Amino acid sequence: MKIIVHIQGNSEKTFASINEALSFARLQVYATQATIIRAFDALQDGNLAQWNYGFTSVAVYPQN
């Protein structure tokens, strides 16, 4: 299964594994608001995870 990370106002990136996707998503969050990083640890494989900060959002989800 491929995992997509979408950053609002930016392009999507596709990853081969959930760990790669979360590593990338974590970097995006660290650059903006490190306090919500704990939420990524709750992501389960196959589920949508999305976090909003300011006028931007980060979504991590499986590719259909």
Mark where each language-model region is.
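Compositionally biased, low-complexity segments enriched in small residues
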Residues: 10, 28-32, 52
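A subset of signal/propeptide-processing and intrinsically disordered low-complexity segments
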Residues: 36, 47-48
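A short, charged, amphipathic alpha-helix used as a generic interaction element across diverse proteins
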Residues: 16-36, 40
